[in-house]
């Protein structure tokens, strides 16, 4: 598993439904070279993939009944292919792991402004070259991507179970790669545990930055990665200027530092002081308090990303906007939730986007979210994974 903020709750649930100390947890990546930044559990060992410490921490793979892979990215493809034949391997789906490498999925993932930023950023770090040399490098890069995709194809072919709550993503994967994997329902905490937080942030400075009387608030995205298409989202939100008194809260506590810096600069030029970059890491209680008090959630990703943001927004009775191509939009629609597509509501004059949901719709959305992502269902799903 990588070092991430929601894995402690997963570990707590797994330990509660399985035999005590029956599992071994290895974090193969952290932003900090020698410590875990987000995971607090003492059961987790930090050992970078490929290091001696990693293979010592894992030990003989044959001793395990099953192996859970959190975020199946390139290094984990290699690890999967090194495991004994017949090993039960569980892929705990994140979204970004399927759409890797980004170069292969670039046309789908990134809209025009974001794609241009990435191209310009790449050009800035490359030295001027003669056209024939540039062509050779492009061919080498294309060959490298082809080899990576072959590795990915083989690794996905070894997966026994895909653990995820959205069948639409499962169908995308099985249509793109040959695999006999079965779908097991699964979602990460804190998708289900909104009730356990007090939700009242004591950070008065943060409240003052984010909320003011008579000012509507938009929560944009969930992180500082280009897959959020924030640069294109700014253009979508621009027509609101002069029509509404609003503020855009943008979670940027983790992501690509260069992209975050560029985004803040660009947003300042378009939205001025309406843009509030949240570059600090926010504890769960504070973060969900922001979601509770914002007016609308604006998700401009083309893929599954920020599911907990969307689910929390729906639980709190907020309007949540997606692109129609996003499988989260389709998932929520299919389950009877009232969500809105950006293409319809933010076209032309972009009117009535802040209109509050009727009380009965808020109540229905909250009820359905609790049915889909309840504490009991989370434990049931993880127990099924442990026993399967």
Question: Where do the model's predicted regions map?
Answer:
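Short N-terminal targeting/anchoring amphipathic segment
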Residues: 57-76, 88-92
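A short, active-site helix/loop in glycosyltransferases that binds the activated sugar's phosphate group
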Residues: 134-185, 381
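Conserved donor-binding/catalytic core segment of Leloir-type glycosyltransferases
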Residues: 205-228, 248-250, 369-371, 383
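Nucleotide-activated donor-binding/catalytic signature segment of Leloir-type glycosyltransferases, i.e.
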Residues: 261-281
